[in-house]
Curated annotation (Swiss-Prot):
EC number: 2.2.1.7
Residue numbers binding thiamine diphosphate: H71, S112, H113, A114, G145, A146, N173, Y284, E365
Gene Ontology biological process: 1-deoxy-D-xylulose 5-phosphate biosynthetic process; isopentenyl diphosphate biosynthetic process, methylerythritol 4-phosphate pathway; positive regulation of gene expression; terpenoid biosynthetic process; thiamine biosynthetic process
SMART domains registered for this protein in UniProt: Transket_pyr
Cofactor-binding details, from the entry: Binds 1 Mg(2+) ion per subunit. Binds 1 thiamine pyrophosphate per subunit.
GO cellular component: cytosol
Keyword Transit peptide: no
Function: Catalyzes the acyloin condensation reaction between C atoms 2 and 3 of pyruvate and glyceraldehyde 3-phosphate to yield 1-deoxy-D-xylulose-5-phosphate (DXP).
Protein name per its UniProtKB record: 1-deoxy-D-xylulose-5-phosphate synthase
Gene field: dxs
């Protein structure tokens, strides 16, 4: 049946029996396709019936359907004509793992940062009103996890003040990655129990009204009592007191019930909350049994067992997790903060070992950072573990709440650099540029597991300002020993005997192996190269300046945007010191990159050892001749 669905119009004639059959087929399709490619399996298994109902009730794309975060949009993609492309999911040139405006007119928003859908919806509804399109509804699908983010409530405050037709579907599965926390989660949990309360009141009403003569009087009295009790106790007041109509809770796996609720909301013609209760991982036993994350995001798996088909090696995240626990065992002042992602950021084990020292603040990066400032003011040393890309959301708090007060807060930035298959909004290529303008901050980029442990310990010893460590996604390679340490930097390679000190190659973090491979290629061309790891990238250390004056050219190699990154910091430091050494930056052009594997993205950008060696050869030739001619660059430097 799924093969016959080319667009939402094909759903309109289906019977309830056919819809149930289609839902089962969609789940089977999801399990086998995502098992092959990896992706967000659990969230999509949980929204099958909800997405069917959305596309039967609303006229997409005339009525925009905006999925907050977007990782639960696979079913939406299938129902809008993209089922045949799922073999390419998250692969280079293939189907994006998130909504994509380039793929379909049904996809309005493609950023995968949470809690933004309601603001998009508010703006679209205003635009439709001002341009005379008053017959268009805007639908925002937001999870209960995203409702822990303050941006949702800023948007609700504005939406509620209007009569614009915005339908807010709360997909309540009790989780983001981990179980949803906080007061909003408690309110939603209570709302799930409301049907029994309402049913009991309705039964009592019928019995009282049946009493001869006085039944009606008693009914009116009890109704007023009920209203008073409900006004003081009913948790849907969280929404209705804002002026929002509330519908629900609705069983999110009963397509007909969801459809009835959505049609009611559509007729209302003003802002409505439709509360839909779903189960993440629905219909797939391995996901339902995964208590930690219900298979929120998976690598390729065996669909029969749910087990990964490839065993991963030691990872950066796991190395950080073990190191932090080791330091915390010795120091009771170390606490940790996560923004709803304890598992992905390596804090689950920390929380199990020190349950009173881990704070999950929900999807609230701004609050996380200022709460960390408060913890530091109280004499503790907080470690905020966060994906690099989500650090963007807390920049003002880093600057004004942490750095201004010179507070010892350590930020651990996972998934720094190119992450690959999740696309542009997950690449962590902005952090060095942002943090480079924060007064007093120290930023480290470890090259291997041993350096991660060392530099984390050094960060935890800082008591007069913020620190940050950044490392990429994936496996951590073998340790790289230093020849020596000079002025705080590790010298990893020196010019071979008989070669000049031509190039100082500054390798940032996990790009150290590439830098060593580049140096080997250049040595084979007779170019002398010194490779250093500055360890602490910001501020630029004296050792970098001391070594720079001994070389003819300085090149930085980094997995950050070249605008304002490590290369910019080094160049500025040399200028301030009046060191006249030519500098070149090799890093990420300041662009948004489509999804592909990390190695594919880097290769497309010319960030391979061969390509980098060719560029440096050209620069060295230009320094010798005064002209940087392309024919001076060998095609192959093997």
């Amino acid at each position: 049946m799924l093969q016959q669905i080319r667009g939402p119009a094909d759903l309109q004639h289906l019977s309830q029996a056919q819809l149930r059959e289609l839902a089962a087929e969609i789940r089977e399709f999801l399990i086998h396709k995502v098992a092959a490619t990896g992706g967000h399996l659990g969230p999509n298994l949980g929204v099958v019936e909800l997405t069917l109902a959305l596309h039967r009730v609303f006229d997409s794309p005339h009525d925009p359907i905006i999925f907050d975060t977007g990782h639960q949009a696979y079913v939406h993609k299938m129902l809008t004509g993209r089922s045949q492309d799922f073999a390419t999911l998250r692969k280079k040139g293939g189907l994006s793992g998130y909504p994509s405006r380039a793929e379909s007119e049904h996809d309005w928003v493609e950023s995968s940062h949470a809690s933004a859908a309601l603001s998009y919806a508010d703006g679209l509804a205003k635009a439709f009103e001002l341009t005379g399109h008053r017959n268009r509804h805007v639908v925002a699908v937001v999870g209960d996890g995203a409702l822990t983010g303050g941006m949702c409530w800023e948007a609700l405050n504005n939406i509620a003040a209007s009569r614009r037709p915005v339908i807010i579907v709360v997909n309540d599965n009790g989780r983001s990655y981990a179980p949803t926390i906080g007061g909003v989660a408690d309110h939603l949990a209570t709302l799930r129990l409301q049907p029994a309360y309402e049913q009991a009141l309705e039964t009592g009403r019928d019995l009282v009204r049946a009493v001869p003569l006085v039944g009606g009087l008693w009914f009116r009295f009890l109704h007023s009592v009920k209203a008073g009790i409900k006004d003081s106790l009913s948790p849907q007041l969280l929404f209705t007191d804002l002026g929002l109509k509330y519908v629900g809770p609705v069983d999110g796996h009963d397509e007909r019930a969801v459809e009835v609720a959505l049609r009611s909301a559509r007729r209302f013609g003003a802002p409505v909350i439709v509360h839909v209760v779903t189960r993440k991982g629905m219909g797939y036993p391995p996901a339902e049994a995964d208590q930690a994350e219900q298979m929120h995001s998976t690598v390729p798996i065996d669909p029969a067992t749910g087990q990964a088909t490839k065993v991963a090696g030691p990872g950066w995240t796991a190395t950080f997790s073990d190191a932090l626990i080791g330091y915390a065992q010795k120091r009771r002042d170390i606490v940790a903060i996560t923004a709803a992602m304890p598992g992905p950021t390596g804090l689950t084990a920390f929380g199990q070992r020190f349950p009173d020292r881990l704070f999950d603040v929900g999807i609230a990066e701004q609050h996380a950072m200022t709460s960390a400032a408060g913890l530091a003011m109280g004499g503790l040393h907080p470690v905020v573990a966060i994906y690099s890309t989500f650090l963007n959301r807390a920049f003002d708090q880093i600057m004004m709440d942490v750095a201004l007060h010179k507070l010892p807060v350590t930020m651990v930035l996972d998934r720094a650099g190119i992450t690959g298959s999740d696309g542009a909004s997950h690449n962590g290529m902005w952090d060095l540029s942002m943090l480079g303008i924060v007064p007093g901050i120290r930023v480290a980029a470890p090259r291997d597991a041993t350096r991660l442990r060392e530099e984390l310990g050094e960060a935890l010893d800082v008591d007069d300002g913020p620190t940050a460590l950044r490392f990429p996604k994936g496996d951590v390679g073998e340790d790289i020993s230093a020849l020596e340490r000079r002025g705080g930097v590790d010298v990893l390679a020196a010019p071979a005997d008989g070669l000049n000190h031509d190039v100082l190659l500054v390798a940032i973090g996990a790009f150290a192996p590439m830098a060593l491979a580049v140096a080997k290629r250049l040595h084979n061309q007779g170019i002398g190269v010194t490779v250093i790891d500055p360890r602490w990238v910001l501020p630029v250390s004296d050792g970098v300046r001391e070594l720079a004056v001994q070389h003819k050219l300085l090149v930085t190699l980094e997995d950050n945007g070249v605008n304002g990154g490590a290369g910019s910091a080094v160049s500025a430091a040399l200028r301030r010191a009046e060191i006249d050494v030519p500098c070149r930056d090799v890093g990420l052009p300041q662009e948004f990159y489509e999804h592909a594997s990390r190695s594919e993205v880097l290769a497309d950008l010319g960030l391979t050892d061969q390509d980098v060696a060719r560029r440096i050869t050209g620069w060295v030739a230009a320094l010798g001749t005064g002209v940087c001619a392309s024919d001076a660059i060998p095609e192959h430097l093997d």
